């Protein structure tokens, strides 16, 4: 399964990073960071309208290289100027061609919150996300225990960050809710085989109480898709490949927000 492979390479990368910089040193780096002055992501999600998390992504396991020309800073700035509410940055290198320095540079250059899009499997990665400018992390229910889901979210909040707790099945949505998640992501992509079912998020949306913001992820391509998700009561959409392939990124974000 692709997800198992992703976790395996993440463990190898984590061990390498831990050898390069100890957790104690990383904590010191985080402690010295200036206060974040970007808009609070959770507060923004609770405001009316459908919010857009625009993703900076060069490749994926299912599609391979999505774009060969990858001016990641220019892309992120275009998203910011177009009115994106947050910017998701892939930092997984082996399957997504991501890198932590993309996150750090983008975080320094945009006015909106940034999400570290990766496979968080250890507290070290949460401190690492913070040290590189992220104010949002992703916690994937399928790869974490109930205790980890709760502990990692609480650690993120202690560091002044938010966690999107991502589910794909009804059972995972239940676990996300039981863990105390304050933001839930419903993925249309099955991370075990990377197949997409757009209706997955529509089917599971009703499981989440209205007081908890919900983000729809993956397979969102058209204005009709966006309108369906808005009508179903989603608070936000995360869009990656569709934006990355577009030559009119700013116009597309503006259109999605306007039509919703």
UniProtKB/Swiss-Prot annotation:
EC number(s) recorded for this UniProt protein: 4.1.1.48
Stated family: Belongs to the TrpC family.
Official protein name in the record: Indole-3-glycerol phosphate synthase
Transmembrane segments: none
GO terms of molecular function: indole-3-glycerol-phosphate synthase activity; phosphoribosylanthranilate isomerase activity
Key words of the record: Amino-acid biosynthesis, Aromatic amino acid biosynthesis, Decarboxylase, Lyase, Tryptophan biosynthesis
Cross-referenced Pfam families: IGPS
Pathway membership: Amino-acid biosynthesis; L-tryptophan biosynthesis; L-tryptophan from chorismate: step 4/5
Keyword RNA-binding included in the entry's annotation: no
Gene name for this UniProt entry: trpC
InterPro entries per UniProt: Aldolase_TIM, Indole-3-glycerol_P_synth, Indole-3-glycerol_P_synth_dom, Indole-3-GlycerolPSynthase_CS, RibuloseP-bd_barrel
GO process annotations (BP): L-tryptophan biosynthetic process
